[in-house]
Each structure stands twice: as structure tokens, then as C-alpha cells.
């Protein structure tokens, strides 16, 4: 048995290794990859490699892998990448895995500056990327976001006088706007905005016109566009697939025959034969998908869409159920917290009641002691009065007294009378004070009974709250194609639809749009003028001032007849 050849294929989020046979074709390897990752929308993708001359090349599916112009790596290195882009991501990308691979590749292109993105849009896209990666904004997701060192294009960071913390804060603020979005919906929102970027989905090739002017040819899902050498954002001339009859090349010369019979051929020159081969291969693939979109879906696509719709609906229901459960959990936890607070308040009230009761008991004992003392004083007073009366009686019985004795007796009687009056007054005061103390004692006893009753009621309420608390705790959920080298020509099938009639840039809701414009002003004020203005930033701002967006520009460059556009191209 022939010895196997080691192959490593890197997708956007995984690394796969295979051992293939020397006679394994590109298609067999491709099929093995898509089967391994569970991908069914295979028509958008291809296997990419660096050839022996250091150029990025697509693996030919109809040829043996080892017979192609590969570098002598061990294992052989390939990247599984998007080769053809859809016209509308929300309508054409069906499977979640397809959407995720597109999202990751588009994000990589923006962060690496392969695709130009304005600073304010970069921040918005970074917030959707954070939602797709971490989920809804929270303290923990914010902390994880600040650990992510690759959230914005390096160009954007270097052009502004802002710290990393300031950038993270702005992305985090936007992230908070997406709380209700699922990770899948965040990916969709990211791609809807990204597909409006001028360089999205365009493959650029260096070409020359007959005058020898260096230009860019852009091949995308809608047709061919020509750009000046220093501006990949704003195409100057466009040829939709619906206006092209035939595409072919001979050596370095590339010829496009328009449908308009009186129009001359659109001719340009590439620097290498292999570049013309790649241009033709991309034209063939893009045109095939262009025509497929304008036909009824195949049974396979219909099945995929139905399955994706069911899965999306099931996930939506699951998210809604989860949201309900989370709301219930939150309400239960809040109820639990309120009960705990009420229990704490009751415990404090009970403690105060106990202290009040203790104080009243002490006051009651003091009053009882005082009352007892007053009773003793009253008894002593009664005893003194009786003794005085006895002495007075004895005095009246004296028959014979001297004048001096009579005077002494009279003084003594007066003193006794005064003492009696004083004791009588003291007795009345004591009786009055005793009555007051008795009333206080009665009130104290009533207060004591009230406190005891309140304590018993609080204890009963406490028991009821503890039972409710246990019930609340039980309610809380537990945490949880390939060009044939001999075929240098493409006959283009026709379709009369104008692809850009209703196409408009995707705009977020007004709130986000206003916030985006505010952020644009903030970032403009923070520009580091010492770095100079980026060429593409300048072009982008000029386009905005002129009221041009991607689709308005494409409509403009397709206006007029084909002959006029070809003449314009020749005269650049």
C-alpha cells in the first residue's frame, strides 16, 4: 500500500490533520474536510495554499493534491476559507456553521485591515463580536473583553490618542446595547453591517489597460469592477454579470465580450498567465452562484432551509423559555432577599422589644420598692400620731401643774400639733405618690403584657416567614469547481434582473445610528494629527461628504451604455 501523505487543514476555528494517498484528488480532500466539520453549504468554500512562488492559490478539485504546485511542507498546509461571497448574507447563508465561518473570516479580514472599516464602525462591529463570543454584557464579560488583545484594527488604535482602557470602555458601552441579542443574532448583525463595507467580498487583481495604466480589477458576487491603483474603495467602471456574454483569455490578455453587440470588447492585461487563470476561475464560480440565486432552490437547499428554520425556531423557544426561567429566578431571588430583609427587621424589632420589656421590668421593681418604703413610712407616721395622742391625753389628766410646766406643756402641745400637721401633709403626699406609683405599675404591667403579646405575634410571623423562605428557596432553579486548465473561456448565461435596484446599506435602528454618529465625532476629535490622515479614511470621508455609499457608487458606475464605460476604461 502506498505511503500516506500528511495534510494539515486549518479552518477559522479548528485545525484538522489527515493522511491522504498520493492519488487523492483535491475534491476528495475537500469532501473529507466538509464531512468532518459538518458543513453542507460547500459551494462558498475552497482550500487555499501558498504555492512554490509564494502566491496564494486555490486547490484545484479535479487534480491530484500532490500534483499541484505546493511547497514541500510536511505536513502539507491548507486553509479552508470562503472563496465566493453571497449577495445577501441573511438570505443565502443557511447553516449556523456556515454563518460562523463567514463571520470569523470577515472579522479576520477587518482586524487585519485587508478590508477597510471606518473607526466608528470598527467599534460597533467589535461590540457585536463581543456579544457573539461572550454573550450578554456583564461584569464578568467586561473583564474577559479587556483581556482580549485583538478587538480593533491596529490602524484604528494607532490613529487616535486614546488608551486601551478608553477603547475597551467604548466597545463595552456598545456591548450593553445588545443585551437581548443571542450569539447567533449578533453574528448576523455583524455580517449585515460588514457586507456594506466597500471592500467586502471583493477579490482584487492587478491589471493594465491598453494604455498601460496600472489598475485593480475587482471580482465579486455581482460582476466585475475597475478601480484606480490608489483607491480600492471607489470603483470607476462596473460590468454586472447580466451585461457580459463571454469571458476568455489568451496568455496575459483577458477579453470580455459584452451583450451589447455594437460595444467593443473589454480588454485588459495581467502580469502573469496564472493570474488570468485565477480571474477566470473566480468569474466562473461567481457567475454560477449568480445564476443559481435566480432559479428556484434545489431540493437540498429547500431541506436545509426548512431544517435551519426549525432549529432556529427551537432555539428561539428555548431562549424564550430560558428568559422566562431567568425572570422567575430573578423574581424569586428578589422575594427571597425581601423576606430576609423583613426577617432582619423583625429580629431587630424583637430585640428592641426585649430591651424595652427589661427596662419596664426594672422600673416596675423600683416602683414596687418605693411603694413598700412609703407604706413603711406611713405605718411609722401612724405610730407617731398614736403616741402623740396618748401623750396629749395624759397631759389633760394632770391636775396640778406649775406655771412653768404648763408653759412647757403648751409649747410641747403646739410642737406636737405642728408635727402632726406636718406628718398629715407628708401622709397625703405619700398617699398621692403611692397612687401615682400604683398607676405607673398598672401601666407597666399592661405594657409588659402588650410586649409579650407582640413578641408572641412576631414569633408566629417569624415562623411563617421562615416557612415562606424555605418555599422560596425550593423555587430557585439549580445553576445550571474548478477551472479546467484547458478551458480558458466562459459563456455567460443571461439574466435581466438589475441586482442593485432595491439594494440599500443596512442601517441599525435610529438610536444606534445617532450613537454611531456621536462616536464618529468623538473619535474625530481624538485623532492623532502627528500620524497623518490614512489614505482610505480620507477617501471614505470624501465619499460620505458626496453622499455616496457602496450601492449608490455601484449604480452610478453601471449607468450609461457599455460602449461608454469601455471607452472610459481605455482612457484611464
Swiss-Prot record:
Location of the region described as Disordered in the Swiss-Prot/TrEMBL record: 444-508, 523-544
Keyword Cell membrane: yes
Membrane topology classification: Peripheral membrane protein
Sorted UniProt keywords: Cell membrane, Cell projection, Cytoplasm, Cytoskeleton, Membrane
Basic and acidic residues: compositionally biased ranges: 525-544
One term of GO molecular function: actin binding
UniProt biased composition (Acidic residues): 480-502
Subcellular location: Cell membrane; Cytoplasm, Cytoskeleton; Cell projection
Any one cellular-component term (Gene Ontology): cell projection
InterPro entries: Band_41_domain, ERM, ERM_C_dom, ERM_FERM_C, Ez/rad/moesin-like, FERM/acyl-CoA-bd_prot_sf, FERM_2, FERM_central
Compositionally skewed regions (Low complexity) per UniProt: 454-475
Annotated FERM domain residues: 1-294
Function: Probably involved in connections of major cytoskeletal structures to the plasma membrane.
Protein name as annotated: Moesin
Organism of derivation: Lytechinus variegatus (Green sea urchin)
Amino acid at each position: 500500500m502506498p505511503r500516506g501523505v500528511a495534510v494539515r487543514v486549518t479552518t477559522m476555528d479548528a485545525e484538522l490533520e489527515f493522511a491522504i494517498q498520493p492519488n487523492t484528488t483535491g475534491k476528495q480532500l475537500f469532501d473529507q474536510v466538509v464531512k468532518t466539520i459538518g458543513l453542507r453549504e460547500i459551494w462558498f468554500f475552497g482550500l487555499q495554499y501558498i504555492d512554490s512562488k509564494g502566491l496564494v492559490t486555490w486547490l484545484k478539485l479535479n487534480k491530484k493534491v500532490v500534483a499541484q504546485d505546493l511547497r514541500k511542507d510536511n505536513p502539507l498546509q491548507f486553509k479552508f476559507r470562503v472563496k465566493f461571497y453571497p449577495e445577501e448574507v441573511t438570505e443565502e447563508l443557511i447553516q449556523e456553521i456556515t454563518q460562523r465561518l463567514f463571520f470569523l473570516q470577515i472579522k479576520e479580514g477587518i482586524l487585519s485591515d485587508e478590508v477597510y472599516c471606518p473607526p466608528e464602525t470598527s467599534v460597533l462591529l467589535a461590540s457585536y463580536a463581543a456579544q457573539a463570543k461572550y454573550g450578554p454584557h456583564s461584569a464578568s464579560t467586561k473583564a474577559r473583553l479587556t483581556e482580549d488583545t485583538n478587538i480593533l484594527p491596529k490602524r484604528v488604535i494607532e490613529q487616535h490618542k486614546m488608551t486601551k482602557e478608553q477603547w475597551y470602555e467604548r466597545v463595552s458601552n456598545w456591548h450593553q446595547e445588545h443585551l437581548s441579542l443571542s450569539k447567533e443574532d449578533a453574528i448576523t448583525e455583524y455580517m449585515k453591517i460588514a457586507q456594506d463595507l466597500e471592500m467586502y467580498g471583493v477579490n482584487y487583481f492587478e491589471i493594465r489597460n491598453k494604455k498601460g495604466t496600472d489598475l485593480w480589477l475587482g471580482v465579486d458576487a455581482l460582476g466585475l469592477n475597475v478601480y484606480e491603483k490608489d483607491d480600492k474603495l471607489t470603483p470607476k467602471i462596473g460590468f454586472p454579470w447580466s451585461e457580459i456574454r463571454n469571458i476568455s483569455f489568451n496568455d496575459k490578455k483577458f477579453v470580455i465580450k459584452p451583450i451589447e453587440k455594437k460595444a467593443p470588447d473589454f480588454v485588459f492585461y495581467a502580469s502573469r498567465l496564472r493570474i488570468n487563470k485565477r480571474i477566470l476561475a473566480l468569474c466562473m464560480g461567481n457567475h454560477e452562484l449568480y445564476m443559481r440565486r435566480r432559479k428556484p432552490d434545489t431540493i437540498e437547499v429547500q431541506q436545509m432551509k426548512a431544517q435551519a428554520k426549525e432549529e432556529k425556531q427551537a432555539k428561539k423557544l428555548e431562549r424564550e423559555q430560558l428568559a422566562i426561567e431567568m425572570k422567575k429566578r430573578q423574581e424569586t431571588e428578589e422575594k427571597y432577599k425581601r423576606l430576609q430583609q423583613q426577617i432582619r427587621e423583625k429580629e431587630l424589632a424583637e430585640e428592641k422589644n426585649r430591651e424595652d420589656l427589661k427596662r419596664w421590668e426594672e422600673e416596675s421593681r423600683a416602683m414596687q420598692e418605693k411603694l413598700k418604703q412609703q407604706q413603711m413610712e406611713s405605718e411609722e407616721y401612724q405610730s407617731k400620731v398614736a403616741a402623740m395622742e396618748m401623750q396629749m391625753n395624759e397631759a389633760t389628766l394632770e391636775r396640778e401643774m406649775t406655771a412653768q410646766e404648763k408653759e412647757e406643756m403648751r409649747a410641747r402641745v403646739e410642737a406636737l400639733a405642728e408635727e402632726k400637721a406636718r406628718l398629715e401633709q407628708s401622709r397625703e403626699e405619700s398617699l398621692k405618690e403611692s397612687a401615682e406609683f400604683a398607676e405607673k405599675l398598672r401601666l407597666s404591667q399592661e405594657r409588659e403584657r402588650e410586649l409579650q403579646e407582640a413578641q408572641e405575634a412576631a414569633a408566629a410571623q417569624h415562623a411563617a416567614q421562615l416557612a415562606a423562605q424555605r418555599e422560596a428557596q425550593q423555587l430557585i432553579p439549580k445553576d445550571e469547481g474548478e477551472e479546467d486548465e484547458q478551458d480558458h473561456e466562459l459563456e455567460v448565461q443571461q439574466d435581466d434582473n438589475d441586482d442593485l435596484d432595491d439594494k440599500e446599506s443596512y442601517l441599525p435602528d435610529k438610536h444606534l445610528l445617532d450613537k454611531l454618529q456621536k462616536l464618529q465625532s468623538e473619535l474625530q476629535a481624538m485623532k492623532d494629527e502627528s500620524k497623518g490622515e490614512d489614505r482610505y479614511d480620507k477617501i471614505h470621508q470624501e465619499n460620505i461628504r458626496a453622499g455616496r455609499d457602496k450601492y449608490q457608487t455601484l449604480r452610478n458606475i453601471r449607468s450609461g451604455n457599455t460602449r461608454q464605460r469601455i471607452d472610459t476604461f481605455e482612457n484611464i
